[in-house]
From Swiss-Prot:
NCBIfam families: PRK11832.1
Disrupted gene: phenotype observed: Deletion mutants display increased resistance to oxidative stress and increased catalase activity.
The organism's place on the tree of life at top rank: Bacteria
Xref: Gene3D superfamilies: Jelly Rolls
Keywords, sorted A to Z: Stress response
Functional description taken from the UniProt entry: Involved in oxidative stress resistance.
Gene Ontology biological-process entries: response to oxidative stress
DNA-binding region range list: 163-182
Protein family membership: Belongs to the IprA family.
Protein known as: Inhibitor of hydrogen peroxide resistance
Pfam family, one: HTH_46
Length: 207
C-alpha cells in the first residue's frame, strides 16, 4: 500500500538536480496563483517554502499543504488535461523550469525512481479527497476532513480556519458545517480556538 507520507528523501534528490537550472520566484501575499495548468502546462514548478492550496476547476479545494511540493513533474511527457491551480497561502518561494528540461535532467541523472515515488504519492493525495467525500453524507465528509486536518502540524492548523476549509473542500453549506462543528465542540469531541482546530478527542461515526 502506498504511504501518504510525503517522500522527502526523493524530493531532496530531485531538488538538488533541478534547482541549478530553475528560475527563482517569490510571492509575498496570500491567494496568488503560483501555477495554473492552462497557463504553465509546459513548466515544472518546485515550491521550497510556504503553504499552498491545490484547487481544481470551479475553484474546488483539493487540499492544503506545506512546502516542499512539485507540480508539473511529468508534463514534459504527457500533458495534464485536468485544470489545477496552486495558490499561495502566505509567503512562498521556489523556482520553475521547462518541463521538457525536467525530463531530460531526470534521464541524465537516473532519477526515474525518485520521480516515480513523488508522482505516486501525488496521485494518492489527489485521489484521497474523492475517496473521502464521494458517496458519503455531509457528516461523514466533515468527519473525514477533520481527521485529515488533525494530521497537519500545529503551525499549519493554527493558520487555517476549520469552517472555511471544510466548506471549500466539501462544498457543504456553511450553516451545516457550523451546526456540526458546534455540536462536536459541545459534546467535547473536538477542541477549537479562534476558529482553528486544536485537538480531536474522539469523533462519533454517526451524527
Amino acid at each position: 500500500m502506498l504511504s501518504v507520507v510525503k517522500p522527502l528523501q526523493e524530493f531532496g534528490k530531485l531538488d538538488k538536480c533541478l534547482s541549478r537550472y530553475g528560475t527563482r520566484f517569490e510571492f509575498n501575499n496570500e491567494k496568488q496563483v503560483i501555477f495554473s495548468s492552462d497557463v504553465n502546462n509546459e513548466d515544472t514548478f518546485v515550491i521550497l517554502e510556504g503553504v499552498i492550496s491545490l484547487r481544481r476547476e470551479e475553484n474546488v479545494l483539493i487540499g492544503i499543504t506545506q512546502a516542499p511540493y512539485i507540480m508539473g513533474l511529468a508534463d514534459g511527457l504527457m500533458k495534464n488535461d485536468i485544470p489545477y491551480k496552486l495558490i499561495s497561502e502566505g509567503n512562498c518561494t521556489g523556482y520553475h523550469l521547462p518541463a521538457k528540461q525536467t525530463i531530460t535532467l531526470i534521464e541524465q541523472n537516473q532519477l526515474w525512481r525518485d520521480a516515480f515515488y513523488w508522482l505516486a504519492w501525488q496521485n494518492r493525495i489527489l485521489e484521497l479527497r474523492d475517496v473521502q467525500l464521494i458517496g458519503h453524507n455531509s457528516y461523514e465528509q466533515i468527519r473525514a476532513t477533520l481527521l485529515s486536518m488533525i494530521d497537519w502540524n500545529e503551525e499549519l492548523r493554527s493558520r487555517i480556519g476549520v469552517m472555511n476549509y471544510i466548506h471549500q473542500r466539501t462544498r457543504i453549506s456553511r450553516s451545516v458545517v457550523a451546526e456540526v462543528l458546534a455540536a462536536l465542540r459541545k459534546g467535547g469531541y473536538i477542541e477549537m480556538n479562534k476558529g482553528k482546530l486544536v485537538a480531536i478527542n474522539r469523533l462519533p461515526s454517526e451524527y
